[in-house]
Amino acid sequence: MVSPALPRLSNPLFFANIMTVKVLIPTPLQKFTSGQATIDCEAANVGQLIEALEANCPGIKARLCDEEGKPRRFLNFYVNEEDIRFLEGTDTALSAGDEVSIVPAVAGG
C-alpha cells in the first residue's frame, strides 16, 4: 500500500522561522491557561503568537483582541519590555528566547 504524499511546502524555511518564546500571562487571563502565569509558545511574530495562544488556550483571543483581530485598547503587549505599538504591532518579529508580556492597562486618578 502506498502512503499518501505529504503536501509540499511553498517555503521550506517556514518552520525555521518559528521561535519558542516565553509568554507572561496576567492573573485575570490565567483561567484560560489552567492557572499558569507563564507558558511557552512557538510563533514568528506577535500575531502568530496570539493565534498559538488561542489554539492552546481556547477563548483567550476574544479577551486579547477586538472584533477586527487587533489587540484590545486597554491591553498592552511587550516584547522584551518594548511596547509593540512602537515597534511593528502584531507584525513584530519574535526571536528564540524572547519574553512577551501581556499587561492590562491601569487607569484611574
UniProtKB/Swiss-Prot annotation:
Cross-referenced CDD domains: Ubl_CysO_like
GO biological process annotation, one example: Mo-molybdopterin cofactor biosynthetic process
Family as reported in the entry's similarity comment: Belongs to the sulfur carrier protein CysO family.
Stored InterPro entries: Beta-grasp_dom_sf, Mopterin_synth/thiamin_S_b, Sulfur_Carrier/Prot_Modifier, ThiS/MoaD-like
Pfam families assigned: ThiS
Descriptive protein name: Putative sulfur carrier protein slr0821
Superkingdom of origin organism: Bacteria
GO cellular component terms listed in the entry, alphabetical order: molybdopterin adenylyltransferase complex
Natural source organism: Synechocystis sp. (strain ATCC 27184 / PCC 6803 / Kazusa)
